[in-house]
Design a protein with these regions (language model features):
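Conserved phosphate- and dinucleotide-binding cores of soluble alpha/beta proteins
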Residues: 2-146
């Protein structure tokens, strides 16, 4: 597990990268954020060709607000401004990707994931290029046209 409270985030990224790269990854479970982010790879700063495996990122206001909406924190002020995240290429390296996206607040993100051009405007759109990605949605998050 990544230690988000590590005293040295850069060293924690290196430690986890070594673990991650030690063996092939069979399954990666992930979600899609309200703005189309995957992990903390927010639009438009997500990098589909990122050379890193794990990195420190600055969380934008939309991502921080989602942490409150998801009841992870009581207020935006309590949400950290930075986080550790797997990069997009690291996630895409899994043999199977199981993506769970429940809730009406994710309907637009699911629409953009499935319908928009593949770009960092909706980082989750890259999931369409993975041959073994399964998207699990509920009635509330399913776009009408899907």
């Amino acid at each position: 597990m990544l230690d988000p409270k590590s005293e040295n985030p850069e060293e924690e990224c290196k430690r986890y990268t070594q673990l991650f790269l030690a063996e092939p990854i069979d399954i990666i479970c992930l979600g899609i954020g309200e703005n189309g982010h995957i992990a903390f790879n927010d639009p438009p700063v997500a990098d589909f060709a990122d050379p890193e495996t794990v990195k420190v990122v600055e969380l934008d206001q939309a991502c921080r607000q989602q942490q409150v909406n998801d009841k992870c924190f009581e207020s935006v002020e309590k949400v950290p401004t930075h986080a550790l995240t797997l990069t997009v290429p690291a996630m895409m390296s899994g043999q199977y990707l199981f993506t769970v996206v429940p809730g009406s607040n994710k309907k637009n993100a699911v629409h953009h994931t499935l319908r928009d051009d593949i770009s960092t405007k909706c980082p989750a759109s890259i999931l369409r290029t993975h041959e073994n990605c399964v998207l699990f949605v509920d009635v509330d998050s399913l776009p009408v046209e899907a």
